[in-house]
């Protein structure tokens, strides 16, 4: 358990390695489970990776795609993670995959209803691909929300970050640790510094990503690009 760190000089080489591991995991999980469930993170950073994954020659029709986290906004909004996946991943060969959103088509003002919907439709992913912010957040588990410190029984939790826009739904620490594998993709000197800080932390953790990297239940493969 814990983590494995793979370092690369540039993002292109980093993505190549991650994609190779993705293919290996995908095919092994398909053989084991007869279906593969993968959760993806949002944000702008993974766009080029999503595009590269979309053209892979895999049995996408046997794949269920879901979200690690989502902002509580309409699916048509530019900041929607569901829109991000539809625009950049669920294209080309990956168009054959099934997609399960975290939010219903019509969003009510009752966040408890939205949370219930997300948990009722949740399917445990075999793999989750994560990113990390310069504040050490991952998924939508932010340092100031303390949700990452809780052993939530729910698979999806509501978070209300004070340093980022929108209320959000996010996979809980429990759900992330129940994955068979986690991939973390980061780049740049600043995020390397955050990673180093997280690796040195001891419980109770101040950084959400540290909680993941020191997990005794799941291994995180960290793909780091210097540039």
UniProtKB/Swiss-Prot annotation:
Residue spans crossing the bilayer? none
UniProt-listed InterPro entries: 6-phosphogluconolactonase_DevB (IPR005900), Glc/Gal-6P_isomerase (IPR006148), NagB/RpiA_transferase-like (IPR037171), PGLS (IPR039104)
UniProt pathway annotation: Carbohydrate degradation; pentose phosphate pathway; D-ribulose 5-phosphate from D-glucose 6-phosphate (oxidative stage): step 2/3
Q: Which reaction does it catalyse?
A: 6-phospho-D-glucono-1,5-lactone + H2O = 6-phospho-D-gluconate + H(+)
Q: Source organism's superkingdom?
A: Bacteria
Biological process per Gene Ontology, one example term:
pentose-phosphate shunt
Q: Which UniProt keywords apply?
A: Hydrolase
Q: What is its EC number?
A: 3.1.1.31
Molecular function (Gene Ontology), one example? 6-phosphogluconolactonase activity
Enzyme class, one word? hydrolase
Disulphide bridges: none
Regarding protein family, the annotation reads: Belongs to the glucosamine/galactosamine-6-phosphate isomerase family. 6-phosphogluconolactonase subfamily.
The job of this chain, per UniProt, is described as: Hydrolysis of 6-phosphogluconolactone to 6-phosphogluconate.
Name listed for the protein in its UniProt record = 6-phosphogluconolactonase
